[in-house]
Every structure is written in structure tokens, then in C-alpha cells.
Amino acid sequence: MYDYIKGTVTTITPEYIVVEAGQIGYQIITGNPFSFQRLEGTEAQVFLYQHVREDNISLFGFQTTEERYLFKKLLSVSGIGPKSALAIIASGDVVPLISAIESEDDVYLTKFPSVGKKTARQIILDLKGKLADVVASEIVYVAPENDMVAGLSPQLEEAVLALEALGYSTRELKKVIPKLAKEEDLTSDAYIKLALQLMTK
């Protein structure tokens, strides 16, 4: 199993890139190969997922570990294969995608190739509340102008702002903040997971 490859990007096509490492050229399928165009001819690090079938071994490449994590989560959904999962995250912006899953916005999800209404509902059913790790690492936090997070620990404040960025209302968050505040010494990820559990009860 490969974790990443570091080498020279030698070729970019509409479907894949080629990274040369140790005098071997590795063909790596990516969601948007042209996002690597600025790296052509230079050394790059690409995070990998190896997909093995009876008749084929493929390498899928990602620019961040968060993209790869989300890709693997999508693969766990019934009806989603590697090509479909890659197409879903091809935009490179995972926050709106996670927000759609958490808010059960199946209309947003059906805009992706090969994702119909049934598959969109399956994605929501399987992944809602399970993507806190990606949320915490991808969202840029901005200090709020209200007092909703005043007096909270840095970890809880970060979690609340992440949930707010995902579209949860102030009213929803204020309902769960007192319960979250009772839990001390949790990480931001743990607070997010707990909040999602409380809000989906």
C-alpha cells in the first residue's frame, strides 16, 4: 500500500498525470489533472490511494490528505465507485460538499456526475455526522462579532465556528453549546462529532 509519491510531474492529460520517481513513471488518476499544471517539470508530493481489482491496479492521486480521506469515505457508500468518488471531489473544495451532506441537501449532491437522487440520499445516510475530521482541518476560522462563543475554550470555539460555517443556525448551536461546555478537555473534532450527534437526535 502506498501513502504518497514524491517525484517530478512529467505528463498531464485530461484523465491522469505521470510522476517520475526512481526512473519509473507512475500513472496517477486525479480528479482534475490540470490542477497540477503549475507543478509540471518540478518535484511534487502526491497522496495516493491504490485500488486493486482482478484485472487492474490503479493509483488515484490527491493534493491533500483531506481529499483522500473524503474519497475513501465516499467509497464506503453503496453505489459509489472510485471514478464517481473522484468526480465528486474534483472541485477541490470539500467544505460545500460536507455542508450539503450535513444539511441533507440532496439537490446539491445530484449535480455531480453519476449521482442521482437515490445515491445522494445514500451518501447522506452513510456519511452525515462522520466527516468532522475533514471539517476541522479544512474550514478557515474567523473571529465572530457576536458573543455566542464568548467564554468558551479554544477547542469548543473552533468547533462552534466550524459548525456555523457548515450552515447550522445560531439557534441550533445555542441549544447544544451548554451541553458541549460540560464536556471538558475534548478536541475540536470531538466537540464537532458530539454536537452533530446532539443535533440529529
Curated annotation (Swiss-Prot):
Similarity annotation: Belongs to the RuvA family.
- Which purpose does this protein serve, as stated in its record? The RuvA-RuvB-RuvC complex processes Holliday junction (HJ) DNA during genetic recombination and DNA repair, while the RuvA-RuvB complex plays an important role in the rescue of blocked DNA replication forks via replication fork reversal (RFR). RuvA specifically binds to HJ cruciform DNA, conferring on it an open structure. The RuvB hexamer acts as an ATP-dependent pump, pulling dsDNA into and through the RuvAB complex. HJ branch migration allows RuvC to scan DNA until it finds its consensus sequence, where it cleaves and resolves the cruciform DNA.
GO molecular function annotations of the record = ATP binding; four-way junction DNA binding; four-way junction helicase activity
Q: What is its main location?
A: cytoplasm
Q: Where is this region: Domain II?
A: 64-142
How is this protein organized at the quaternary level?
A: Homotetramer. Forms an RuvA(8)-RuvB(12)-Holliday junction (HJ) complex. HJ DNA is sandwiched between 2 RuvA tetramers; dsDNA enters through RuvA and exits via RuvB. An RuvB hexamer assembles on each DNA strand where it exits the tetramer. Each RuvB hexamer is contacted by two RuvA subunits (via domain III) on 2 adjacent RuvB subunits; this complex drives branch migration. In the full resolvosome a probable DNA-RuvA(4)-RuvB(12)-RuvC(2) complex forms which resolves the HJ.
Query: What Gene Ontology terms describe where this protein resides (cellular component)?
Result: cytoplasm; Holliday junction helicase complex; Holliday junction resolvase complex
Q: What is this protein called?
A: Holliday junction branch migration complex subunit RuvA
Question: What's the gene?
Answer: ruvA
Span list, region Domain III: 153-201
Q: Provide a GO biological process annotation.
A: DNA repair
Q: Where is this region: Domain I?
A: 1-63
Record's domain comment? Has three domains with a flexible linker between the domains II and III and assumes an 'L' shape. Domain III is highly mobile and contacts RuvB.
- Where in or outside the cell is it found? Cytoplasm
The answer on whether this UniProt entry bears the keyword Cell membrane reads no
State the source organism's domain of life: Bacteria
Q: Which Gene3D superfamilies match?
A: 5' to 3' exonuclease, C-terminal subdomain, DNA helicase RuvA subunit, C-terminal domain, Nucleic acid-binding proteins
The alphabetized UniProt keywords are: Cytoplasm, DNA damage, DNA recombination, DNA repair, DNA-binding
- Tell me the segments the record calls region Flexible linker: 143-153
